[in-house]
Amino acid sequence: MSIKLSAGALASLPANIAVPKYRRSDLSAGIIHFGVGNFHRAHQAVYLDDLFNSGAGHDWAVIGAGVRAADELVREKLGEQDWLTTVAEQEATSTKARVIGSMIDFIPPGDAAATLDALARPEIRIVSLTITEGGYYISPATQTFDSAHPDIVFDSRNIDAPKTVFGLIVAGLARRRKAGLAPFTVMSCDNIPGNGHVTENAVAGLAELVDPELAAWIRRDVAFPNSMVDRITPATTDRERRMLHDSFGLDDNWPVFCEEFRQWVLEDKFPPGRPALEKVGVTFTSDVAPWEWMKIRILNGGHASIAYPAALLDIHFVHEAMQDAQISAFLEILTKVEIIPTVPPPPGVDLDSYRDLIARRFANPKIGDTIERLCFGGADRQPKFILPVAADRLKSGARVQGLALVSALWCRYCHGETESGKTIAPNDPIWERIHAAARRARQDPGAFLEMRDIFGALADDPIYVAAFSEALLSLWARGVRPTLGKYLSDHGVAA
């Protein structure tokens, strides 16, 4: 017999499920979080839960918020269980379950008035974001704020009823400024290099369109700390719900399954105050950049490197890709030869050891992370995780054969079928465009590089163009395995 998760059921849960040690009625809100997806609930919410369990920080509970239609479903499902979430931490030989209680409310998505009222509350001192890499209105090629985007233009003309996260933040800050309240800190927790700077440019950039004086105040008085976040967290499916039911006798509308490993490095820049997260393992520093580059280039770049060859070979799970000798060897050589040389090591970190840790995490068979998830949104992810590494290599006169091959594999994937002929379902917000470019590129590889908002100056670099073209033509003429084999043999590895 199973138990349905709710606040009233906590005392009845089996002993092998950890529950909050604090009284949730003692919590009060200090944070509004936009984007209450799986990653937030497996990461920031867990760290806060740890802090609350220690007896500290009870005035830093989370209120959820969102602007997408999908956020309403999350609110509905979490509301049915009193905003509680079950987090199942999985290693190869064990699974541990715990109930997280750090969120205490969720503003109805689409209710701009209620959201703005909440943002104006003096006790709200942090607004945090996990809105995905593609949610920041940044031009992929220039990495600058896209002030001409229709959503941004709309908000600039309707700032009292905005429809974007940034419109709500700007309007909320304007209210606080008018009321003489200190501004809240805006904390991005997305996988973007310099995510604090990117967020500041989006918020201040929109404010500039509304009120230049407000924009100047934001740039002067609002803090946007940079951060590095890390925890592999797959999407939730019925598979995970069944596993929780079968293994723990608990029914959760939207549980989160993740790896045991987690890491959070934060720039210590919170003028209105912050929770004492250093007590529960968060690293605070004055310079997050080395940690960001390490994680984004080695882990996220590694994900991109195995995703597309695995997808084209009909491999479903990430751990299965790591069991493929050729794909795992490609990841190892590419990371050692082309990626790590572009990464300045954080203090006290050995990058080769970090790479080995990443490989072990990818190989965890319990996680159930899918290749489809890693392939999603390549048009946003390639310009953040792969193309800048290639650009840095070219600036130093180094070779980019492996990095160009990763992007060629993405192009081949975007053509829309695997090597066995199976159809690849659209898997990118701009799928129609990249699919059309990939089809043209089968005969003319340069046609894919013509998407200059993605490839930027690389599209005009003859060395990169030649490497990309050679890789793509080989993928079509010879196939994935011979092309990977050629790269490996060029580096002395038997394929």
Where do the PLM segments sit?
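Substrate/ligand-engaging "lid" and interaction regions
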Residues: 1-495
